From Swiss-Prot:
It comes from the Bacteria. HAMAP family: Leu_tRNA_synth_B (MF_00049_B). GO terms for cellular component: cytosol. The gene is leuS. ATP binds at K636. SUPFAM superfamilies: Anticodon-binding domain of a subclass of class I aminoacyl-tRNA synthetases (SSF47323), Nucleotidylyl transferase (SSF52374), ValRS/IleRS/LeuRS editing domain (SSF50677). This is Leucine--tRNA ligase. A motif ('KMSKS' region) lies at residues 633-637. GO terms for biological process: leucyl-tRNA aminoacylation. Its EC number is 6.1.1.4. It comes from Bartonella bacilliformis (strain ATCC 35685 / KC583 / Herrer 020/F12,63).
Length: 875
């Protein structure tokens, strides 16, 4: 019998059209069934989806389809994170308006995503640049302003003088703007802030409740929030050696914040931020210090960047009096690694027990005094090389602290300094600090959500009345020069003050695009609502049960979303505290890189051959050899990208989906390979061939589990596979589910190819097994599952079928296989009934041929049996 090959292009388009026509993926909050909300992080509309998108959205779709089959009312929406810098860059480079560029890209990417057969409720689609969306975002801004969670204050920012905008710390590379290459300036600008610090304690405490989040993400957020117990320590200043003492008048002390006051006897210097008031005062009369400060301001100010940058300091001539030993004076430095916005902008350095301080001390030849030693170490023998000792131990070289643990020493120092007085005040004070800082949301950009505030010369800053929202971006703007077009648009800026009616100016800053993505999940629950949410409907869906996205969003996006949920609850828009119950961070899609003398070479320009046991790569154009490089994340810059459209056109969406799920655990990177995608395609064709051969007979057979013989064994395999795959999908272990389905088809294939020769009981068991198989592949390869289900006589869409129920009696194992060791070395296995007692197991083991061969007349000294685990024969 000739079987026509499965044509994915034709069949996938057919089933997608049927799904659309029947609107089977549209969700109503009024539908019966337990609600389940699955959401993948929505994409930026760059113009093309990449294989990372394919993997991410396939995973979410598997969850959505599986939960739907389990009878749940599933919400699985899609939208676009559409504001941002790239659209303005495109406007400048290509003379196209950001709005036109963005919506063109959305249309192209929507078409690509729809080709994947995703079970998305497209009726809820929105882009964050839709006026309808940012109108509601402006409502939220005003609500938070009324609640005191929005403030306007002066902040130091990274200013790009060419692009004329504020840059995030991450956008400053070696002191230069990431796009313009200009030397970045540190400026003080008045900015809008969300008071995320108001929720610092709650954001930290609730991390322990997020048990369905990866531990790594929770640790990253914990460190970012950075709660620390410490001590404010006030140091008296000795300015007698200061060349320009008049510049430091009025400063008689410096307050440091430290989490390690136990190490005070190891202190050898104080370091101040370049923005510390003492540093600024000293710089007024010191040109060299001013130059040093300007140099420090040219670098990135992120904690991460400062930790890796070379430690640099400027010795001021000021000395600090040691609070526990007034006879000791420590030099005061201005240093590039001290941040003004953490603690007090001043620290004391204990080189022996902090690596940063040790690096600094080595560079400037400062004393290194060990004050904590491991408990087991001999005090006189314990030394340091180039690594600070940061472990626990006992205090040494620390006067009245000697012999205490660092924890106890902390308390003793705190009590001592709280009683000791300097200038009429306690010299020490216990305190709690957070690394978390308020979220600056002002951006000097056009393509963002306008901040709904008005500046009036008479009334000050006035919120736009809610009735006057939305503040809509003007479209008559030009991008012929850098900077913010809104700041040059006089007619848009000019508005009557809502309070006094006099001419006033609109705020020209727009919101950070992270604001847009901090609440979109809530809008999806009722995108038609006049308010930002329909609170009753939101309460039915939120929090999102399963959120899927990259670990690169572990801190900013996910932390901001958690803050926003709390802020929106305070404003009466939602009832929940947390936005996402479950979080899954998938790995990246990576690919080999190829390079020749001219640069990077794309995979489709290369042929790979095996020569002398080695893989070699040659350009298709001239057969010149290219170097096979490392496996890296797909990127346009290295040309190691694979276009999903090409894969779908060549192999079909189901093949792409199957490969994305099959090759490695979903939390790990998947290595793209042509052989891998071809293997997935062969499996698709094999499935169809088996179904097409057997369907004429099986479509007439009623499914039923076998009761005896081979039919019973087949049904056991079917029900056990169903049980295992169900467990895998619940755990998002997609690759394990795929492996089981490969094995299951291997069991069924010989029977499917000879179905006419089977007895009636086996045919019924095989029909049930195939029904199970179709149901199990449906979340992963939905088009193929529909085609197979229809060929087998299915009267409804596979996408509307319930998940099968396995028979618990058929999944019970009646035998167990145990590894058999002889003198501790494995020699083979033994299979015994689950109910076998020790004597029966011993008898079965002694009957094994490899055991008999090892005995060779010897007697068994003893046999160790660990039930259901292992057997060890000791000779």
């Amino acid at each position: 019998m000739t079987i026509e090959r499965y044509n994915p292009r034709a069949q996938e388009q057919k089933w997608q059209a049927i799904w659309d026509e029947k609107k089977i993926f549209q969700t109503s909050h009024e539908d019966e069934g337990e609600k389940y909300y699955v959401l993948e992080m929505f994409p930026y509309p760059s113009g093309r989806i990449h294989m990372g998108h394919v993997r991410n959205y396939t995973m979410g779709d598997v969850v959505a389809r599986y939960k739907r089959a389990k009878g749940m009312n599933v919400l699985h929406p899609m939208g676009w994170d559409a504001f941002g810098m790239p659209a303005e860059n495109a406007a400048m480079q290509n003379k196209v308006h950001p709005k036109a560029w963005t919506y063109q890209n959305i249309a192209a990417m929507r078409k690509q995503l729809q080709k994947l057969g995703l079970s998305i409720d497209w009726s809820r689609e929105f882009a964050t640049c839709d006026v309808d969306y940012y109108h509601r975002q402006q409502m939220i801004f005003l609500d938070l302003y009324q609640k005191g969670l929005v403030v306007r204050k002066v902040a130091k920012v990274n200013w790009d003088p060419v692009d004329q905008t504020v840059l995030a710390n991450e956008q400053v590379i070696d002191g230069r703007g990431w796009r313009s290459g200009a030397l970045v300036e540190q400026r003080e600008l008045t900015q809008w802030f969300f008071k995320i610090t108001e929720f610092g304690e709650g954001l930290l405490a609730r991390l322990d409740d997020l048990t369905e989040w990866p531990d790594k993400v929770r640790v990253m957020q914990k460190n970012w929030i950075g709660k620390s117990q410490g001590l404010y320590i006030r140091w008296a200043l000795d300015k007698t050696q200061l060349p320009h003492n008049d510049g430091c008048e009025g400063f008689d002390e410096i307050t440091c914040y430290s989490t390690r006051p136990d190490t005070l006897f190891g202190a050898s210097f104080l370091a101040l931020s370049v923005d510390h008031p003492v540093a600024q005062a000293l710089a007024r009369n010191d040109e060299e210090l001013r130059a040093f400060i300007e140099m420090c301001r040219c670098g990135s100010t992120t904690t991460e960047a400062l930790e890796t940058a070379e430690k640099q300091g400027f010795r001021t001539g000021v000395l600090a009096v040691h609070p526990l030993n007034p006879a000791v004076r420590l030099p005061v430095y201005i240093a590039n690694f001290v941040l003004m916005d953490y603690g007090t902008g001043a620290i004391f350095g204990c080189p022996a027990h902090d690596q940063r301080d040790l690096d600094f001390a080595r560079k400037y030849d400062l004393p290194v005094q060990i004050v904590v030693a491991p408990k087991e170490a001999e005090e006189q023998d314990f030394t340091l090389s180039d690594t600070a000792y940061t472990g626990d131990g006992v205090m040494i070289n620390s006067d009245f602290l000697n012999g205490l643990t660092p924890k106890d020493a902390f308390e003793v120092v705190a009590q001592h300094l709280e009683k000791q007085v300097l200038n009429g005040q306690p010299q020490g004070q216990k305190t709690v600090q957070f690394r978390l800082r308020d979220w600056g949301v002002s951006r000097q950009r056009y393509w963002g959500c306008p901040i709904p505030m008005i500046h009036c010369a008479a009334c000050g800053v006035v919120p736009v009345p809610r009735a006057d929202l939305p503040v809509v971006l003007p479209e008559d703007v030009t991008f012929d020069r850098p900077g913010n077009p809104l700041a040059r648009h006089e007619t848009w800026q000019t508005v009557a003050c809502p309070s006094c009616g006099q001419p006033a100016k609109r705020e020209t800053d727009t919101m950070d695009t992270f604001v847009d993505s901090s609440w979109y999940y809530a809008r999806f629950t009722a995108p038609w609502a006049q308010e930002p949410t329909d609170q009753d409907i939101a309460a039915q869906w939120l929090p999102v049960q399963q959120y899927i996205g990259g670990i690169e969003h572990a801190i900013l996006h996910l932390l901001y979303a958690r803050f926003f949920m709390r802020a929106m609850k305070l404003a009466g828009h939602v009832n929940a505290d947390e936005p996402f119950t479950g979080l899954f961070t998938q790995g990246m899609v990576v690919h080999e890189t190829y390079r020749d003398a001219q640069g990077w070479v794309a995979p489709d320009e290369v042929s790979i051959v095996e020569q002398d046991g080695k893989r070699r790569a040659y350009k298709l154009t001239d057969q010149s050899e290219v170097t096979i490089g490392s496996i890296e994340k797909m990127s346009k810059s290295k040309k190691n990208v694979v276009d999903p459209d090409d894969i779908i056109s060549s192999y079909g969406a189901d093949t792409a989906r199957w490969f994305m799920l099959s090759d490695s655990p979903p939390e790990r990177d998947v290595i793209w390979s042509e052989s891998g995608i071809e293997g997935a395609h062969r499996f698709v064709q094999r499935v169809w061939r088996c179904v097409a051969l057997s369907a004429p007979i099986l479509s007439t057979i009623e499914p039923c589990a076998g009761h005896q013989g081979e039919a019973l064994e087949l049904s056991k395999a079917a029900h056990r596979t169903l049980c295992a795959v169900e467990d895998d999908l619940e755990k998002l272990a997609f690759n394990r589910a795929v492996a089981r389905l490969y094995e299951f088809l291997n069991i069924m294939a010989p029977l499917l190819n000879t179905v006419a020769d089977l007895d009636d009981e086996m045919k019924s068991a095989l029909r049930q097994a195939m029904d199970f198989f179709c149901a199990m592949i449906a979340p992963m390869m939905p088009h193929l599952a529909e085609e197979c289900h229809a060929a087998l006589g299915g009267k409804t869409l596979m996408s509307e079928c319930a998940w099968p129920v396995y028979d618990k009696a058929l999944i019970v194992e009646d035998s167990v296989t145990l590894p058999v060791q002889i003198n501790g070395k494995k020699r083979g296995d033994v299979t015994v009934p689950v109910t076998a007692d020790q004597a029966e197991i011993e008898q079965a083991v002694l009957a094994l041929s490899f055991v008999q061969a090892q005995l060779a007349g010897k007697s068994v000294k003893k046999m160790i049996i660990v039930p259901k685990r292992i057997v060890n024969v000791v000779l």
